[in-house]
Amino acid sequence: MNHSFLRSVRSFSFLLGMTSLLTACDDDSETASVNKIDLAFQALSDNNQLLQFNANNVASAPTAVAITGLQSGEKILSVDYRPATGQLYGLGSTSRLYVINPTTGVARALGAGPFTPAINGTSATIDFNPTVDRLRLVSNTGQNLRLNPETGTVAVTDGTINGAATATVSAVAYTNPVAGASTTVLFDIDPTTDKLYRQDPPNDGTLVAIGDLGVNATGTAGFDIAADDNNAFAALTVNSRSGLYRIDLTTGRATLYDNFPTNTTIIGVAIPTKAVAYGVDSDNNFVAFNPTSPQTQVTKPFTGLQSGERIVGLDMRPLNGQLYGLGSTNRLYTINLASGAAAVVGAGAPLPLTGTNFGFDFNPTVDRIRIISDAGVNLRVNPTDGVALVDGVLNPGTPSVTAAAYTNNFAGATATVLYDIDSNTDILYRQDPPNAGTLVSVGPLGVNTTGVNGFDIGGTSGTGFAVLTVGTTASVYTINLTSGTATKGADLPRPLQAMAVGLGF
């Protein structure tokens, strides 16, 4: 055998192996094997469609949902879930903010018109700051705004993006996207420089480089961070193919999970937030908690109330996702979801109320607050000016209703049913018709509850949730709206008075 030939073959094999190794190293961010996690998310395509994927399989094409309710020719540029309510928000190209139903695709504009200053650029991205419940907007020209998610207006115009001369930010995301978060960090993705940045401080717009993505991304990116573990994911277009990438927030490295279906270009990623509800504890603190795991709570004192006043009722306004509260001095308040600050509605004149415990819930079809009490009071209140209409006293007999909730708890609802809990008879009633105050028995709760309770119905799930105190134990219950049966879930650390569930749940 020719030994010279063997040496040549071995040399060629070595060089071929080294070339393959170097090529593999160069493409590591795209080809590395990853342990995929089970994580559902919404993806926004470049043609105004929502697609629900799971991170462990984005190659299979789900049924797309067309986004409707927009202005003529308008496109949704970016989407994100609001941690304080669980609702999906979208940014329109006409400088409008929308709440979008992820199941139907129906978009509802917030505010009377486009916000000002308008979007400056051909692309823009949004993400919620969970510590202050405001939307960060950054455009490809460096515009840097804070938006109010309840009014759809610009809250503050912040400093233009700076610190990286050639950077063109395409996607942003905050860490710790949970209601009541006390800390958060804002990260930016720039497909022009193919880098991950930290925007620090966010209001100044200063970019601090974290590291290279390790891929050559083009076009518009989508980016979001999961609430459970701060896992970060981005939709990036690489080699003309849109794919889901996991982003290392420490190094900036992008690792390909999988490509999205062929001919699908994804420009936005939104990971659902954790379920959230709000209540009031015995010390008159504002409490945020997950109704499925309520032992962990975020507690803040209410501010802006009258001396010695307590909040005795809570509910979210379906029209705009704003939280309202009823004070023990019979005043109506709006409540800041991030801080617990209360602001009186209207002239602050006391409502014509009597009683000790109250039901307090929005009728979504007419945008009015129903307030009822254990003394039989039955009111309709305008949430804009606090003016009340007195309806028929609760009947028959002398019921002791201490909680109330309407079904179809979302803006634009055309029908709704009002349910009441009587803590004296421990029965769920249907109030029908509501204005007449007539109670129709649905069925027994099956537990002996006190008047210290709260009740709400999820705007998306349609599930009845209640916080009930039975004996000395306070727990979260689900309420069967057909039979009245209360099914116990997890225990609470302490009893809560009043309850409002995030509209996205």
Where are the model-predicted features located?
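Sec-dependent bacterial lipoprotein signal peptides
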Residues: M1-T23
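N-terminal segment immediately downstream of the Sec signal-peptide cleavage site
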Residues: V34-T68, E74-I76, T85, R253, ...
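Short loop/turn segments that connect beta-strands within beta-propeller blades
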Residues: A55-V58, N101-G105, N148-G152, D200-D204, ...
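Structural motif
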Residues: N47-F53, R96-N101, Q143-N148, T193-D200, ...
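Repeated scaffold domains used in trafficking and secretory/extracellular systems
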Residues: G73-D80, F115-F128, N162-P177, N216-I225, ...
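A short beta-strand motif characteristic of beta-propeller blades
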Residues: P62-Q71, V106-P117, V154-G163, T206-V215, ...
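Conserved beta-propeller blade signature
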Residues: A40-L44, Q87-G90, Y98, R134-L137, ...
